[in-house]
Amino acid sequence: MRAMSKSLTILGIETSCDETAAAVLRYEDGRATLLSDVIRTQLAEHAPYLGVVPEIAARAHAELADLTVAAAMNASGLSYAELDGVAATAGPGLIGGVLVGLMTGKAIAQAAGKPFIPVNHLEGHALSPRLSEDCPFPYLLLLVSGGHCQFLDVRGLGDYRRLGSTIDDAVGEAFDKVAKLLGLGFPGGPAVEALARNGDPKAHDFPRPLLNRPGLDMSFAGLKTAVARASANAKSEAEKADICASFQAAICDVLAEKARRALEGFDAGAGDKRFVVAGGVASNKAIRAALETAATAQGARLIAPPLRHCTDNAAMIALAGAEHLAAGLCETDGLASSARPRWPLDEASAKADPVFGAGRRGAKA
């Protein structure tokens, strides 16, 4: 498909995990303007189970998808005829939810006679800072979420090279498991972060796995095991706070050191060195502060999306769809695309060097 230079208006749909989201975005001259941005969470549905239940998530998406899209279109003040395309997450993620959003998007595109753009959810996160920041390529990306933790060299749209990944648990997964061990409820990340503010980060000398090993690969399973041992005897809120603070400090140390190494070897070309952090865990203030320090020490600028766009959202999906459509990089027939529970962002290198155990839902990158 050839590139488009005119202003583009795109409907984006996101249903890969436990948020049902829709957004309408206008893209012109490389700049995005959000016309609507609707996110419906499923926290109440999953809280009793202390985690996301795929079947419950899929049913909730099926109930909410049409209503969420209608709300986004109404808020934008536009009709479907005024859209230039429809983008939806086609993976990776929980397959039941991905299917709901994908089929909803295809149906709207078919009925309105508009192009359909299947979007990689991870690419949505990778591009998310461009919703609100001037963030030209290339840049170093740390994608850190419940299912992923990886450093990527982002050279351009569709041009991604993995530099390092977790070899077992993702950071967000580790936060959720620590919260479960301490009985802090769901979602675990915000609960651990909140309690950590009242604790002593030096109370426990938790391991920093792979910290001194060359390269950018990470591991968090051993840290989680150490927390499990410490939490077995933790009864008071003060003891739990110390565990949370010490755990979070270990995470910060690992991410900051790996970021320092990544930035040290990153080729920014003739431009400024930019370090982007994206994904749900990017909303953690302690982690942001540690990464900011690492970036500054390497003469780089840390860029992160607003908190609303760190977690799953449809604005980033609409942006990815718009950028692909504008560049003429869309599939010839997006309606023929399939839902993909696994979809590495750097597909070529992932086939040559797959990462196993990259998150709670298996090796997706």
Swiss-Prot record:
The keyword Protease does not apply. InterPro entries: ATPase_NBD (IPR043129), Gcp-like_dom (IPR000905), KAE1/TsaD (IPR017861), TsaD (IPR022450). It catalyses: L-threonylcarbamoyladenylate + adenosine(37) in tRNA = N(6)-L-threonylcarbamoyladenosine(37) in tRNA + AMP + H(+). Its main location: cytoplasm. GO terms for cellular component: cytoplasm. Binds 1 Fe(2+) ion per subunit. It holds the Pfam family TsaD. It is found in: Cytoplasm. Substrate binds at residues 143-147, 176, 189, 284. This is tRNA N6-adenosine threonylcarbamoyltransferase.
